[in-house]
Amino acid sequence: MVLVQDLLHPTAASEARKHKLKTLVQGPRSYFLDVKCPGCLNITTVFSHAQTAVTCESCSTILCTPTGGKAKLSEGTSFRRK
C-alpha cells in the first residue's frame, strides 16, 4: 500500500474528477460554440451554458434551449467548439 501522493504531478484522471477550482491549474469548463442553423445554414455564436433560448437571426428557429447546466442543442444543428 502506497501512502505517498505526488502533488506536483497529478494524473490526468485525478485532475478530471476534481472541481474546477481545486485543480492544479484553475480554469473554466464553459466555452463558446459556432452553431449552424439546419434551415438557412446561418452560423450563430452560442455560449455553452446559455440561460435563455437562442434563436436564428434570419429564420427564427430555436437553436438551443437552456437546462440546469449546459444548453441543449436542437435536433439537426451542427456545432463547432471555438
UniProtKB/Swiss-Prot annotation:
What biological-process terms (Gene Ontology) are attached? maturation of SSU-rRNA from tricistronic rRNA transcript (SSU-rRNA, 5.8S rRNA, LSU-rRNA); ribosomal small subunit assembly; translation
Q: List the subcellular locations.
A: Cytoplasm
UniProt KW keywords: Cytoplasm, Metal-binding, Methylation, Ribonucleoprotein, Ribosomal protein, Zinc, Zinc-finger
Query: Which Pfam families does the record cross-reference, listed alphabetically?
Result: Ribosomal_S27e
Query: In terms of one coarse class, where is the protein primarily found?
Result: cytoplasm
PTM sites of type S-methylcysteine: 40
**UniProt PTM:** The N-terminus is not modified.
Q: Which PROSITE patterns match?
A: RIBOSOMAL_S27E
Gene Ontology CC: cytoplasm; cytosol; cytosolic small ribosomal subunit
Record-linked InterPro entries: Ribosomal_eS27, Ribosomal_eS27_Zn-bd_dom_sf, Ribosomal_zn-bd
Q: Where in the chain are the C4-type zinc fingers?
A: 37-59
How is the cofactor bound, in the record's words? Binds 1 zinc ion per subunit.
Q: In terms of domain of life, where is this protein from?
A: Eukaryota
Query: Among its keywords, does the record have Ribonucleoprotein?
Result: yes
The cofactors it requires, by name, are:
Zn(2+)
Q: Which family does it belong to?
A: Belongs to the eukaryotic ribosomal protein eS27 family.
Question: What the protein does?
Answer: Component of the ribosome, a large ribonucleoprotein complex responsible for the synthesis of proteins in the cell. The small ribosomal subunit (SSU) binds messenger RNAs (mRNAs) and translates the encoded message by selecting cognate aminoacyl-transfer RNA (tRNA) molecules. The large subunit (LSU) contains the ribosomal catalytic site termed the peptidyl transferase center (PTC), which catalyzes the formation of peptide bonds, thereby polymerizing the amino acids delivered by tRNAs into a polypeptide chain.
| Further remarks about this protein from its record | Present with 43300 molecules/cell in log phase SD medium. There are 2 genes for eS27 in yeast.
- Protein name, please? Small ribosomal subunit protein eS27A
